[in-house]
Structure formats: structure tokens, C-alpha cells
């Protein structure tokens, strides 16, 4: 009896955990996009966020303010180290994507596109970013 219940419950629990991890990854990616856009607007310099599918991390970079009078630099510098958006092997992204945010809040993809997918092998979530930075996560 216990074996029958375990045979049913364990696969269901694994699928539920995979679903939670996919939702968490979508939330992390969405939050990183929105937060990076707000930083670009607040600081007044361009920012980028790069999502790497192989390492399941994202890296934020900016053209830092320097000089007198203060001005944005002409090249991007990473802010801190890469941050995981998911657990390696659990959730995949396609394609790797880099989004650039202008101080006006506009978004342009420099690698990939404004739409990419996250998948856990069972289900998929599509992240769509509008040109003005609105983020929508959809499940097909």
C-alpha cells in the first residue's frame, strides 16, 4: 500500500517542485529586468542586463557616472558579480539575451530579442518585454 502511494506521490511532488522552480526563475528574470530599467532611469545612464543560459545567471552593467561635471562613461562596467536566476539543470532559457536600457526607460535587445522562453522540460513560460520596459510572463 505504501509503495503504491509513494509511486504516485513522489513523481507528483517532483513535478510540483519543478513547476515552483520555473515560476521562481520567471519571477527572478522579470524582477531583474524591471530593476535594471529603474536604475537606468534613476541614475540617468545606460544599463544592460545579460541573461546567460549556460550558467543560469544574469549580469548587470552600466556606464558609470564620473568626471566633473558628472557624465556617463563611454563603456559598460559590470556591477558586482553574476547573480543566479535559476538552478542549473532545472530551468533553461532560450536564447541568451542582453537588454540595454536607456535613461528614458526604452529597452533594446543587443543580443537575443525582447521575447525569450524559460522551460523546465514539462512546461514553458515566455517572457515578453515591450520597448518601454513592461514585462509580461505568459504560459502557453
Positions of predicted regions on the chain:
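N-terminal single-pass transmembrane signal-anchor helix
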Residues: 1-13
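Type IV pilin-like appendage domain
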Residues: 46-103, 125-128, 136-140
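Short, surface-exposed interaction loops/tails
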Residues: 109-140
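Secretory pathway export signals and precursors
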Residues: 5, 41, 65-68
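Membrane-proximal N-terminal amphipathic helix
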Residues: 15-47
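A short, compositionally biased
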Residues: 52-57, 108-114
Amino acid at each position: 500500500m505504501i509503495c503504491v502511494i509513494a509511486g504516485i506521490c513522489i513523481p507528483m511532488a517532483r513535478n510540483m517542485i519543478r513547476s515552483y522552480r520555473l515560476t521562481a526563475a520567471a519571477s527572478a528574470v522579470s524582477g531583474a529586468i524591471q530593476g535594471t530599467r529603474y536604475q537606468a532611469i534613476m541614475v540617468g545612464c545606460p544599463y544592460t542586463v545579460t541573461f546567460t543560459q549556460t550558467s543560469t545567471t544574469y549580469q548587470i552593467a552600466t556606464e558609470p557616472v564620473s568626471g566633473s561635471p558628472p557624465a556617463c562613461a563611454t563603456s559598460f562596467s559590470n556591477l558586482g558579480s553574476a547573480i543566479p536566476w535559476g538552478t542549473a539543470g532545472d530551468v533553461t532559457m532560450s536564447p541568451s539575451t542582453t537588454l540595454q536600457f536607456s535613461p528614458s526607460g526604452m529597452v533594446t535587445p543587443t543580443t537575443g530579442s525582447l521575447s525569450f522562453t524559460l522551460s523546465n522540460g514539462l512546461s514553458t513560460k515566455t517572457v515578453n518585454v515591450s520597448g518601454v520596459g513592461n514585462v509580461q510572463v505568459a504560459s502557453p
